[in-house]
Amino acid sequence: MSISRSLKIVATLYRYGLDDFLEGHSRLAFLHKLFGLCPVRRDTSAPLPQRVRLALESLGPIFVKFGQVLSTRRDLLPPEYADELALLQDRVPPFDGDIARQVVERSLGRKVEELFVDFDLKPVASASVAQVHKAWLRQPDGGRGREVAVKVLRPGILPVIEQDLSLMRTLAGWVEKLFADGKRLKPREVVAEFDKYLHDELDMMHEAANASQLRRNFKGSDMLIVPEVFYDYSSREVLTLEWMHGIPVGQIERLREAGVDLQKLSRFGVEIFFTQVFRHGFFHADMHPGNIFVAADGRYIALDFGIVGSLTDTDKHYLAVNFLAFFNRDYHRVATAHIESGWVPRDTRAEELEAAVRTVCEPIFEKPLSEISFGMVLLRLFETSRRFNVEIQPQLVLLQKTLLNIEGLGRQLDPELDLWDTAKPFLTKWMNEQIGWRGLLRTLKHEAPQWATTLPTLPRKLNEALGSAKTDLLVEGYIQLMREQKRQNFLLLLIAILLAALLAKSLL
């Protein structure tokens, strides 16, 4: 741990009066006095949430990124802090283009002139982890090939990140041990989540894989374009993508002048979101306006694939159940769905959770449906969840953040956008497919290889369970065996029914 970096953090906390958090804490009274020895001018004129944001900005890009991640954890933070941290911007001066050139050559093992016809040393975009340069691939005959964006990892960033993460882990441990609310805030868990997020961003091949997956999911789509990845020109430090031409989605007047149908575009955004979540179970989780452009043909263009989310079939099912129940005001079903999914502890009383959900949702539903925010519904529920010791899953936090971005974007394009009217047919159709014959056939097809493997092993499993010397293992093994036997019998019965139906049809 760097002493100079630690001292800078202490001085910054004191400058913005954040040592006030220590006030009244008997075990930390000596620290509060030590802060007073800092030879730094103290400014406490701004509200405390704003001072937290300013302190993070002063501590540099890694702390800014941490604040951005923290702003999504509305299940942990009071609203005024989450709102203030959401204002943080990842603004970092670019590093020298010649250094970027050296990184490319070292990482790809070839001279830039051998890889590209032109490589613009002036970056078109810069952030804390990487910056982007424009280039053209060199064809075998030496001619100019495809226009590309070359994303280059900032050199020397890893030691800086590891140093700051080490300090964050130490601070998180202190908060958890010394503050009454420390365990509920789960600071070490939040830092661990941030650690994973940062290290994913440091590996350009991780982003390349995300882009490829999303591109495959939307192949031939009339709503979304995802740039092609050039793997022969990519590595852990360099990512080369197809250059995309378009208008930034936030430039509404330019879109109008280009003849883009803004109402259609806003609906596309909602449909793209729900398609990613419920069809693919894999979604772009950083869809703020800076990462979205609009092509000449009116399709969205997605950029920056460092942050994605994924959902299991169970997550998708309960999300759909919750959305449909919310907008039908079936709060009891919302409560039971939360308990069934494991999002709240099993011993939670459904009636108490139902009452809490009703308290959150009824004021929201007094508004016209076109003004209701899906994201705000989830946000309010996250805030309510603190009363019920809810374990908010990271993928659901990403989902809520993405949904807020999509809603904000959609209503910026079309203030009259009725999100529920756009989403309900999609959700209803998806649910019908899951519980109807199509869903059954899809499940049978998916599970068939597992049945073929599992059924022959049942006698051996029974013998192993009966031969166990420990009673608890015997009982557990027997229960598990009976459950599996019932499941297999039920599925075999369904197969028999389907085969009989097909046979009867062929005989008619």
UniProtKB/Swiss-Prot annotation:
InterPro entries, per database record: ABC1_dom (IPR004147), Kinase-like_dom_sf (IPR011009), Prot_kinase_dom (IPR000719), UbiB (IPR010232), UbiB_bact (IPR045308), UbiB_kinase (IPR050154)
Residues passing through the membrane, by range: 488-508
Cell location: Cell inner membrane
Pfam families, per database record: ABC1 (PF03109)
Enzyme active site: D286 (proton acceptor)
Example of a GO biological process term: regulation of ubiquinone biosynthetic process
GO molecular function: ATP binding; protein kinase activity
Ranges of residues in domain Protein kinase: 118-494
UniProt entry keywords in alphabetical sequence: ATP-binding, Cell inner membrane, Cell membrane, Kinase, Membrane, Nucleotide-binding, Transferase, Transmembrane, Transmembrane helix, Ubiquinone biosynthesis
Residues that bind ATP: V124, A125, S126, A127, S128, V129, A130, Q131, V132, K151
CDD domains, alphabetized: UbiB (cd13972)
Pathway(s) this gene product operates in, as recorded in its UniProt entry: Cofactor biosynthesis; ubiquinone biosynthesis [regulation]
Single GO cellular component term: plasma membrane
Protein function: Is probably a protein kinase regulator of UbiI activity which is involved in aerobic coenzyme Q (ubiquinone) biosynthesis.
Protein name: Probable protein kinase UbiB
